[in-house]
């Protein structure tokens, strides 16, 4: 789900597992009732199944909801297990998650701007 996200978007993950049979209305109700967030806001909501090999993303586009689904053929997402919790993550943490890494990286390697060999 390597999509270009709109500017200034909030990204939320539903920690723990979600019943992946839920569709747009069920996921939007979960966002509103369980997490007390606005599903119509400028936010991307991510949900993961029990096996951690598939995720759904819910996004309000102004004229309707967009529901995206990704199933990994090999591997699992490093999904936080805090049941009944929603967590806001940064765009960088979103990229880590989609690439199979944990959203809680201890340290990242900084890029070197200088290109001089001594």
List where the protein language model places each region.
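Polybasic/polar functional segments that serve as interface/processing modules
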Residues: 1-118
